[in-house]
Amino acid sequence: MTAEEMKAAESGAQSAPLPLEGVDISPKQDEGVLKVIKREGTGTETPMIGDRVFVHYTGWLLDGTKFDSSLDRKDKFSFDLGKGEVIKAWDIAVATMKVGELCRITCKPEYAYGSAGSPPKIPPNATLVFEVELFEFKGEDLTDDEDGGIIRRIRTRGEGYARPNDGAIVEVALEGYYKDRLFDQRELRFEVGEGESLDLPCGLEKAIQRMEKGEHSILYLKPSYAFGNAGKEKFQIPPYAELKYEVHLKSFEKAKESWEMSSEEKLEQSAIVKERGTVYFKEGKYKQALLQYKKIVSWLEYESSFSSEEVQKAQALRLASHLNLAMCHLKLQAFSAAVESCNKALELDSNNEKGLFRRGEAHLAVNDFDLARADFQKVLQLYPSNKAAKAQLAVCQQRIRKQIAREKKLYANMFERLAEEENKAKAEVAAGDHPMDTEMKDERNDVAGSQSQVETEA
């Protein structure tokens, strides 16, 4: 029976008391949730905790009174399974359904609206009956932009509400799959942010930071959150590959948050992290280095309790971090971000040689030649012996000359075409066969003929 057939069958038919029947699917086996399958679904998969599910439903009281129906609204109802967005009976029952399945669910009050009811349609302590049809379900998108790059499906819910933060020590068991081929199977203990050194994709670390202790989840990673356009030769993963991971977060120890650290701790940790970032940078692990330098900025940027001596140390670390961030962004070809990091560095030291030079490089990379030239000229004004700036300024000048030459040629061709068209039009007018001239002659003949006709008729 389809959703439309359900609606047709229900119209006026549910007037007699409804029977209590079905298989007990309540966790306590207390007959709190009874289920009868009216039409089998397809496939073998059922929704998991956190999945977005899409259903049509109709609800009745036990006396047959209908109190709600998504069919009447002609709009499917959706919710996140297992998140407490609906009554308990629904979270329990829909988790057992397959796509296309139609079932009847009978819910005791403690699995529905309890002693409070849901006025005015549902009285206190009401047993409810629903018919539910499952159309679709999909995993939870964990990306900031909701671009579908990291999809999570929770096999087993974790405990509590705490989650690993950046720098937390996590203990995980994982399996990585590429097209059903198991390519990675390990138990690891590592610091969040260090995953790249263990050949873990960035999307996996990002997902781990959304997990709870004891959680077992399936993760689907798009290429930009997996091994990207480089692939991973060690695992025989080609470029632009989509991956699947099964991850069990066994335990974790949270790192101290910024607000939990003293000013002295922040400076000590920043110095350690700076060295770690430098090691990653030298190894060509620019994303890893980026994470380290970002930590320093987050710890020090808004700290107001430093002593006068600590302020100088903090400023030096912040300046170095912004400059190093700019260098990482340049290596990763994130040129706008590189400019932003240079600007932050130049706010701390307006004549900083590296800040001006790296900003010039970022401008040059995106063909902002005038801005790049200004930065390189400023470097040479302040530091005349900077050979790299001289070389880059020469590149700028050369590209600006080429750009001017291209524009001159473009405009010359444009003006030449316009002149040719103008001369051609003049020649056609002189010959009397210009389209506009012909049209005007036709119009004059039409007008003359009309006038003659009017005069004759008059």
UniProtKB/Swiss-Prot annotation:
UniProt feature, compositional bias: Polar residues: 448-458
A biological-process GO annotation: chaperone-mediated protein folding
InterPro entries noted in UniProt: FKBP4/5/8-like, PPIase_dom_sf, PPIase_FKBP_dom, TPR-like_helical_dom_sf, TPR_2, TPR_rpt
UniProt key word Magnesium: no
Domain annotation PPIase FKBP-type: ranges: 50-138, 167-253
Sites of N-acetylthreonine modification: T2
PTM sites of type Phosphoserine: S450, S452
Activity regulation summary: Inhibited by FK506.
Keyword Cytoplasm in annotation: yes
Catalytic activity: [protein]-peptidylproline (omega=180) = [protein]-peptidylproline (omega=0)
Bias type Basic and acidic residues, positions: 434-446
Subcellular location: Cytoplasm, Cytosol; Mitochondrion; Nucleus; Cytoplasm, Cytoskeleton
Modified residues (N-acetylmethionine): M1
PANTHER family (UniProt xref): PEPTIDYLPROLYL ISOMERASE
Free-text comment about domains: The C-terminal region (AA 375-458) is required to prevent tubulin polymerization. The PPIase activity is mainly due to the first PPIase FKBP-type domain (1-138 AA).
Protein name stated in the entry: Peptidyl-prolyl cis-trans isomerase FKBP4
Species, as recorded: Oryctolagus cuniculus
Gene behind this protein: FKBP4
